[in-house]
Amino acid sequence: MTPTLKAAAFAVLVAGAGSVSAFAPLTIVDQGSLAAGGTVIQNDGTYDNDAPTAAGQTFHGDHLYAFYQVPENARPLPLVLWHGAYQSGRSWETTSDGREGFQTLFLRRGFPVYVIDQPRRGRAGNSTVAASVEPTPYDQLFFDQFRFGRWPDYFPGVQVDQTARTLDQFFRSVTPNTGPYDPRVLADGVSALVDRVGPAVLVTHSQAGGPGWLTAIENANVKGIVALEPGSGFVFPEGEMPEEMPSAAGTLTPEAIPAADFDKLTRIPIVIYYGDNIPTEPTTERGKDNWRVRLAMARLWVEAVNRHGGDATLVHLPEIGITGNTHFLMSDLNSVQIADLIARFLGEKHLD
């Protein structure tokens, strides 16, 4: 156990040039970081200390990185916060406009929190499979796809601070894969983490949705899943696959898994949240239509889980009167309200 840390009373949180905020004190009784999962490649030959080559050497890769904090009087189940595509653990830290992120909001609610960088991303960049990282311009595409608006205009009423400084901070949170995207590698990494941590709840965002289901299938220590706008990896029992869903952004294809594996998803409570500005009818607007099919597929997925005796819920926020949310529910201006919804779910399902 590390010495008690008094955090945030005098914390400096930089949202942009010259922006400083101080938050109420928060007592942290333990914190640290670790790697989990991964593999080791062993080269043939003998290592020569004085004439080193690749011969006989090893390479550690495909692990995840986790930073954890445990608050005073912690609840029993930690939350594992798992970022989406082109993101890292920073997604859950200070928001782009300088407010407390989910990392801190849930520490304040008494949950131990593990913030991860998944394998082949961020601080877990060692990939055992080669890939190239090119300086590809895609800021405007992300602005549209994450439903801030339709570049260069924001949607009316969108839950985003519209200053140039905040947008700059968001774009600088983008980070690439350092190896090929492989959901099994990601699931293995998070499974190794919960093996070490013990029973936990996954909080996934976007691309992490699919690997999140796989982790729950792989490891019974996953006691529940909160999925924020899952974007792919919708798994269905073999023989119960819905049709592919074409959109202006491409075709969304469901994935088949054995019925016995799918059944494991029926044993834990699951909730899925989607934000605003998602159409119900096809549109040529790529950024919106991309999420139309994902929301539709998620509805079918929830129906399938419940049809097999599970406990899955989908919440489309505008349907309960919460409007303006982007793809980044956890960092939108109403992120405290979203955190309250999640905390209520965790309480109702005895995951707190």
Label every model-predicted segment.
Residues 324, 328-352:
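Catalytic active-site module of serine/aspartate enzymes centered on a nucleophile-bearing elbow/loop
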Residues 180-201:
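Conserved acidic catalytic loop of the alpha/beta-hydrolase fold
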Residues 76-85:
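Short beta-strand element of the alpha/beta-hydrolase
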Residues 203-212:
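Gly/Ala-rich beta-loop-alpha elbow adjacent to hydrolase catalytic centers
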Residues 220-235:
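A conserved short beta-strand
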Residues 232-308, 313:
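The feature captures the conserved acid-bearing segment of alpha/beta-hydrolase catalytic domains
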Residues 23-74:
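N-terminal cap/lid segment of alpha/beta-hydrolase-fold proteins
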